[in-house]
Amino acid sequence: MAKHPNQTGWYYNENNCIACRACEAGCKQEFDLPVGVRRRRVIIREEGKYPNPKVRYLSTACNHCEEPSCMKACPVGAYTKEKIFGVVLIDQGKCIGCKRCAAACPYGAPVFDEKKSKMDKCTFCIHRLSEGLPPACVRTCPGYALWHGKLPDIEEQRTPPGIYRRPLTKTLPGFADPKLTGPSVRFSENK
């Protein structure tokens, strides 16, 4: 699959995340998601030993990958890569709930909706992007730990304006190898 010219991506600044889970709540509220279905998750990792322990936070969702493993694994073609923003979407009308996409995704993005017996995942709030608005998770993050934009703009630090000026990385501890699927996310690591 060729690189999408306007690929929308995530930016996550580990230094600004306080693990308040406002991003999770904003997403759940935007989509009225049932208990057990979380399109965005804050992962808390403890590292090190006394006297130098460290706690790290990672807010993660679907990374709308360049080479989506979920799409390749789906036996009924329920996944597509949308043309305007490069967002990976699932057609729940086609989904048979086999969970192969969840098994294939190294980032744990697709989740099973027990009520619908279908898979669910982050849509990057494409309905909001289409109106020029930020995704719900970005809108609700009080610490500006989460941002979105065109991936080239994020990589060249043109967006978000004034929020960061640190070296970017394609991975953090606890995040799967980006060489697997080409995730559309960049990080500023906690220093």
Cite the ranges covered by each PLM segment.
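Non-ligating segments of multi-cofactor redox enzymes
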Residues: 1-191
